[in-house]
């Protein structure tokens, strides 16, 4: 493993872990105890554009279905797990260029390491992937489908100190604002918006400042909130349907393959899924062409279907009227709230209802992750 960063390091992120992400981490034998500020959450409050709140509870006593873990700590813990497993991890070494990438081998030039030869390269190097750029395969002017702002807040004395909030305000749709609880009365607070002609950076900066004056948000956060450090902003790529997935002996994963959920901007589970899919493709095939085909087919049968569903739902949620109606239906019965919140947190694949091959008897009734810890 080679990374230009030296861990621990901050990472612009909402820090939310869905059920899918939690199950994958458990499958990788990752321990939540290695993340000091890990916080499981049970209550989810979603506010409609008309101001009405939908309160939903994730199952208790059945494992973890949602958690918040600061990426500075989570990523460092994953790096330490790799080191403990005997995996060489080279920190603080930047990628320079691809020297060779053909049917026989792939070699890359790494700062401080020199020329490195490998059977395959899995490029988890972000939306602006330097590896993809080195191969002249980047899209000029591409800025992502979403843009997000985030800041940590302390001294939160409102209900947001314990409960997870999502606000679908009219001017954010199909985006939203969020408050994800952390230990010691801290939260990860932010918002995300889809990029279009009306959402310039100046508009988003103005919106960011305005959020702190909105009464419903102030009511959730309380009246003693203290912003920590500065806010950070980042682009979110969500176009796995037409992103470059692989070339030669190089496979792109995570943000480098634009794998985030286009409806929510969530990407931790997708990064883990694509990384595992790339590793499986390499392990179970003999030739580069077979590896690329296997990897691409895996993405087509899993993430691509979910991407199309999220894209469709995102268009629906662009309308305040439609969003109000959807949330009114969700709030109509205990049954709809119970199953909607599990679907919302990726207890099942986003498009599972329309992909029968992924149906199973325990649909939306499976236990969460880490049952012995919850």
Regions found by a protein language model. Give the residues of each.
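Short beta-strand to alpha-helix junction loop
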Residues: 16, 60-81, 196-203
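Glycine-rich FAD pyrophosphate-binding loop
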Residues: 1-13
């Amino acid at each position: 493993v080679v990374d230009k960063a030296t861990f621990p390091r901050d990472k612009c992120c909402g820090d939310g872990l869905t059920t899918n992400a939690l199950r994958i981490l458990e499958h990788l034998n990752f321990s939540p105890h290695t993340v000091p500020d890990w916080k499981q959450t049970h209550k989810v409050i979603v506010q409609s554009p008309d101001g009405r709140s939908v309160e939903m509870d994730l199952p208790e006593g059945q494992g973890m279905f949602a958690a918040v873990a600061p990426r500075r700590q989570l990523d460092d813990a994953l790096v330490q797990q790799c080191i403990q497993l005997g995996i060489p991890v080279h920190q603080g070494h930047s990628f320079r260029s691809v020297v060779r990438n053909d049917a026989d081998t792939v070699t890359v030039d790494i700062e401080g390491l020199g020329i490195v030869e490998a059977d395959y390269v899995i490029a988890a190097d972000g939306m602006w992937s330097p590896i993809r750029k080195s191969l002249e395969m980047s899209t000029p002017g591409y800025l992502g489908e979403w843009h997000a702002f985030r800041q940590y807040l302390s001294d939160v004395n409102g209900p947001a100190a314990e409960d997870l909030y999502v606000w679908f305000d009219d001017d954010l749709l199909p985006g939203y604002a969020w408050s994800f609880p952390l230990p010691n009365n801290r939260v990860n607070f932010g918002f995300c918006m889809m990029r279009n002609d009306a959402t310039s950076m100046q508009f988003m900066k103005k919106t960011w400042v305005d959020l702190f004056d909105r009464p419903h948000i102030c009511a959730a956060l309380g009246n003693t909130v203290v912003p920590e450090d500065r806010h950070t902003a980042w682009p979110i790529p969500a176009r796995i349907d037409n992103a470059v997935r692989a070339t030669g002996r190089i496979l792109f994963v995570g943000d480098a393959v634009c794998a985030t959920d286009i409806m929510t901007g969530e990407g931790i589970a997708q990064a883990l899924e694509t990384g595992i899919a790339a590793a499986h493709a390499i392990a179970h095939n003999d030739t580069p062409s077979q590896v690329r085909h296997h990897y691409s087919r895996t993405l087509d049968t899993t993430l691509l279907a979910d991407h199309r569903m999220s894209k469709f739902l995102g268009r629906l949620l662009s309308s305040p009227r439609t969003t109000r109606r959807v949330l009114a239906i969700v709030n109509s019965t205990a049954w709809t709230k119970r199953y909607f919140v599990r679907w919302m947190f990726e207890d099942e694949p986003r498009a599972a209802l329309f992909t029968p091959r992924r149906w199973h008897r325990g649909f939306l009734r499976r236990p969460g992750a880490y049952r012995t810890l919850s």
